Amino acid sequence: MNKSKRPFTKSKRSFRRRLPPIQSGDRIDYRNMSLISRFISEQGKILSRRVNRVTLKQQRLITIAIKQARILSLLPFLNNQKQFERSESTPRTTSLRTRKK
């Protein structure tokens, strides 16, 4: 078969490399809340390495920093805001109840 007539070849598309979430100057520390909060979900869970796009070493340091911040109560262990939010209350209709004797 002729190599020039390959039916299933994909065209190569150029792609932009994403910027790393942690620059070389950033210190992964429990006090650096602006950095740590990027790696926590809305529920307060630590995001995975694939989602964060960080190296294994960086993920370990992030995890340790988040756990230290939780112990020192800089971060909450759980972030369940919905549990405590009150929904729109409907006004109760007060009706006079008659007692049956």
Curated annotation (Swiss-Prot):
Pfam families: Ribosomal_S18 (PF01084). One of its GO terms (biological process) is translation. The keyword RNA-binding applies. It is found in: Plastid, Chloroplast. Gene3D superfamilies: Ribosomal protein S18. Keywords: Chloroplast, Plastid, Ribonucleoprotein, Ribosomal protein, RNA-binding, rRNA-binding. GO terms for cellular component: chloroplast; mitochondrial small ribosomal subunit. One of its GO terms (molecular function) is structural constituent of ribosome. InterPro entries: Ribosomal_bS18, Ribosomal_bS18_CS, Ribosomal_bS18_sf. Residues 1-19 have a biased composition (Basic residues). Part of the 30S ribosomal subunit. HAMAP family: Ribosomal_bS18. This is Small ribosomal subunit protein bS18c. It comes from Draba nemorosa. The gene is rps18.
